[in-house]
């Protein structure tokens, strides 16, 4: 566990340093890299901090602020911010220039507002403070899209829900995100009881803007309000939802990994003759018998259930097989028809008495994937695909790890939301679990399959 944690942390730091070098190179090419900025970038200990620092220097489309700067309005914005006793309307008169499309003082002030809004929204330290405030205080609200109630009935628990961002359980967050992606739910951030006020106050205090009755205070307060509502609120909402998604995915992937570990490390039934039954109704129950080493001895299909209802014939065959091959275990897949098949085997046990084998319900997750795989085709080239699944069911009772290692971990079905998380991270995590389990248990070089040996470290 410690080695895996170290491996993940090392990977993160390598990605962080690679991104750091890219950012330093980009800013240096812009001739804007100061020693102070370089020190801040080199000291950044997270990708979020790194991107916040890089934000003002990112190549972006021509903004209203850039147009205003090109029109010579930067000094106006700087002057009002530096000295709030200046009258904005009067000061802006000196920047009226018809050739630059600044026909009135209002045009000049609008340009200055755009410059300050962009400046206020690009401060790395302010972004970090606002993001932390949001994480601590904000609520996440989900509502059903009008007219989608019937179509989205499976999401009814989230039609009207509001919960703290930092405490929402991962499964609930992933369900809401799925509902939003499917167009059933719409989500919003409820910032605080006083809605936007605390965040606007934070922006104002960071830039030393406070309404003290001075000539420019009202105008500057309006700039702060616009900065939060137009630029920062949506930006931070995206960042906070991303944080919820990442935290939920990490938690869910951890649960999936533990589920897979439990499956792989389930106690093996051992080297015993096993009857594997892959239940089915219309298509019948696929039956196979494997010897203690997993070698295939017998295949047949029985039809005890509807619509065929050949119960007695199927029962007689099961009893006959158990006696002839001295079957010690019966592995019954847990798919469609499992309960009815279990009843059939129970009746066979009663007829066999003291020599009856033990019957066990086995998860058949991934058996169909294995059946159609190249590995199964190489192992059983002449065997019908439908029987390969029954062989897998029988063998995974004998030795779960040795059999399940042949199946792609994601195909084993380890969790409800496994398709909603990062597939790259999920695959990496589950592959690590399989490798750890194999190396924890060890392998017998004389009998281990190639897929099992491939998971041995080194």
Set out the residue ranges of the language-model regions.
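Long, highly charged, low-complexity intrinsically disordered interaction regions
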Residues: 17-18, 22-32, 378-458
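Duplex nucleic acid-engaging cores and interfaces of nucleic-acid transaction enzymes
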Residues: 2-6, 12, 16-276, 282-383, ...
């Amino acid at each position: 566990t410690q080695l895996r944690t170290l491996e993940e942390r090392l990977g993160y730091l390598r990605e962080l340093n690679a991104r750091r070098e890219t950012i330093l190179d980009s800013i240096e090419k812009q001739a804007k890299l100061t020693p102070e900025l370089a020190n801040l970038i080199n000291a950044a200990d997270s990708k979020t901090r790194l991107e916040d620092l890089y934000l003002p220097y990112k190549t972006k489309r021509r903004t209203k602020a850039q147009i205003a700067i090109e029109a010579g309005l930067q000094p106006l914005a700087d002057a009002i911010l530096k000295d709030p006793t200046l009258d904005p309307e009067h000061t802006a008169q000196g920047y009226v220039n018809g050739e630059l499309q600044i026909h009135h003082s209002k045009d000049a002030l609008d340009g200055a507002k755009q410059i300050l809004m962009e400046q206020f929204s690009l401060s790395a330290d302010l972004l970090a403070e606002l993001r932390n405030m949001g994480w601590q205080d904000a609520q996440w609200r989900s509502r059903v899209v009008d007219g989608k109630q019937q179509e989205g009935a499976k999401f009814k628990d989230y039609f009207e829900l509001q919960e703290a961002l930092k405490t929402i359980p991962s499964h609930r967050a992933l369900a809401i995100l799925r509902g939003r992606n499917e167009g059933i739910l719409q989500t919003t951030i409820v910032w605080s009881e006083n809605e936007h006020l605390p965040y606007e106050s934070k922006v104002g205090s960071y830039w030393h803007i406070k309404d003290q009755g001075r000539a420019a205070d009202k105008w500057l307060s309006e700039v702060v309000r616009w900065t939060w509502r137009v630029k920062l609120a949506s930006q931070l909402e995206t960042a906070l939802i991303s944080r919820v998604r990442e935290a939920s995915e990490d938690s869910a992937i951890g649960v999936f990994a533990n589920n897979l570990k439990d499956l792989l490390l389930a106690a093996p039934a051992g080297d015993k003759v096993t009857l594997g039954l892959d239940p089915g109704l219309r298509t019948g129950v696929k039956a196979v018998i494997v010897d203690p080493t997993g070698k295939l001895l017998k295949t047949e299909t029985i039809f005890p259930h509807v619509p065929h209802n050949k119960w007695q014939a199927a029962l007689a065959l099961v009893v006959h097989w158990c006696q002839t091959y001295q079957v010690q275990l019966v592995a019954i897949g847990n798919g469609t028809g499992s309960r009815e098949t279990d009843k059939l085997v129970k009746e066979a046990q009663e007829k066999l008495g003291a020599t009856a084998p033990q019957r066990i319900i086995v998860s058949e997750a991934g058996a169909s994937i294995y059946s159609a795989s190249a590995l199964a085709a190489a192992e059983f080239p002449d065997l019908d695909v439908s029987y390969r699944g029954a062989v897998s069911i029988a063998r995974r009772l004998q030795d779960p790890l040795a059999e399940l290692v042949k199946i792609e971990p994601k195909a084993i079905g380890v969790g409800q939301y496994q398709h909603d998380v990062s597939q790259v991270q999920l695959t990496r995590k589950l592959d690590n679990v399989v490798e750890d389990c194999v190396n924890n248990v060890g392998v017998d070089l004389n009998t281990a399959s190639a897929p099992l040996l491939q998971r041995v470290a080194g």
